[in-house]
Amino acid sequence: MDKMSTDKQLLLDVKDLKVHFSIASKSAWPWSKPANLKAVDGIDARLYQGETLGVVGESGCGKSTFARAIIGLVEATDGEVVWLGQDLTKMQGVQRRETRKDIQMIFQDPLASLNPRMTVGDIIAEPLETFYPELNKEEVKSRVKEMMAKVGLLPNVINRYPHEFSGGQCQRIGIARALILNPKMIICDEPVSALDVSIQAQVVNLLKELQKELGLSLVFIAHDLSVIKHISDRVLVMYLGNAVEMGEAHAIFSEPKHPYTRALMSAVPIPDPKLERAKKIEMLEGDLPSPINPPSGCVFRTRCPKATDICAQTKPTIQGNDVHAVSCLHVTA
């Protein structure tokens, strides 16, 4: 994929990232080889300062594994995760620890991500106390209250416990914890999927406001295209561990190229009843194949209406530029 010039600083450059897991064989034979699950299989992606990269795809497509490999929660099998010119996959010890201040994460289940035995104040303060032990208690408490105010939490709840809060409030606590170290980038792993629709909008708008105020860059993972469209500057569409389409959000949503992206877009409801009735639904046949035994050639060919014999023989590569790129033998960006 060709890189186009931009005035913004390139923070994250993911190159041919692969995350494979060895799965024990269910065979009764003791000498059976373990299976190889390809959770992420050669992803390229870029994120510029102040932008949001939206990652979308069906459940099981590798979105969360991709995000966790960036931050180092799962080990990359191959490829590079270049952060400000340095490959995170090769960092260890003190050097890797220092980068953790710049890259934080918000998790999918807001309540499960919070320690039930710790107060809200202690949860938010924990990263600060870990990386800046020289701060006294009053300084820590002051910063915690300041961050609570930024995310819309009242200071008088600082001594309460997670179970006393709603899902949306718990996610605000998680956001405050991620922001307390003043990171450059936050990875949001489906942060609104466990919340009610009305609360989803509040959390997404809060993230957009904080991004504008603090100059944050976001990697935002979701399966809801309407959320991705609302928050993203760039979009990466994943299918079975592979990137099938990527580019600027306006290009992806105004003219989706890949058959999989088109099918996802056609499933999004349109508020206007006349347009909703008139639109063409592009159906996908069959289920998502197993990542342990993916189809040969193009991984999407078993569900693709455009598939031909060559699709079973040749695996397409992503072609295009930073504005719009697609991975299909029958479509060009």
Q: Predicted regions span which residues?
A:
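A short, proline-enriched helix->beta-strand linker immediately N-terminal to the Walker B motif
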Residues: 180-184
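ABC ATPase NBD coupling module
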Residues: 30-33, 88-104, 130-133, 137, ...
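Conserved ABC ATPase signature
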Residues: 161-165, 169
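Conserved ABC ATPase "signature" region
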Residues: 87, 138-156, 265-266
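Charged, flexible cofactor/metal-binding loops and thiol motifs
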Residues: 5-7, 24-31, 248-333
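P-loop NTP-binding/switch modules centered on Walker-like glycine-rich loops
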Residues: 191-195, 199-276
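Conserved ABC transporter NBD signature motif
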Residues: 79-87
